């Protein structure tokens, strides 16, 4: 799971990790992200608070050159613009983008997140 490292997004990443119990899940800020962190993943998640964070530059570049066809990806944010941005940077990678998760108030229900994750895993 790659995030922009903001407190709000990291607070959403933690219950996603909880919903993925039984999987080897790592939460990594985009600043510390290395390409090989995502290459072996069967499913990955991206989250940012605002569109085009500077820390996502390397990730954007990588996603434009590597094919993730049939690998599932979930994106989450607190803004529609950020969800659109995240969906856009995945386009060239051909990752199987699931339904996006929007938390406009920064809050969440673990049951809703678990349901969202289970849908992505189908």
Question: Whereabouts are the PLM-identified features?
Answer:
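Short beta-strand/turn micro-motifs composed of small residues
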Residues: 1-4, 77-79
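FMN-binding flavodoxin-like domain, especially the glycine-rich phosphate-binding loop
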Residues: 10, 15-30, 35-122
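Short, surface-exposed ligand-recognition loops at beta-strand->loop->(often short) alpha-helix junctions
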Residues: 7
């Amino acid at each position: 799971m790659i995030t922009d490292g903001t407190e709000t997004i990291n607070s959403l990443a933690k219950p996603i990790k909880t919903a993925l119990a039984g999987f080897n899940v790592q939460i990594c800020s985009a600043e510390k992200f290395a390409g090989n962190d995502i290459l072996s993943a069967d499913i990955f998640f991206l989250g940012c608070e605002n569109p085009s964070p500077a820390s996502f530059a390397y990730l954007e570049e990588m996603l434009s050159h590597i094919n993730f066809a049939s690998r599932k990806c979930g994106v989450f944010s607190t803004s529609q613009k950020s969800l659109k941005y995240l969906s856009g940077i995945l386009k060239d990678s051909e990752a199987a983008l699931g339904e996006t998760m929007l938390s406009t108030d920064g809050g969440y229900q673990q049951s809703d997140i678990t349901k969202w994750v289970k849908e992505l895993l189908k």
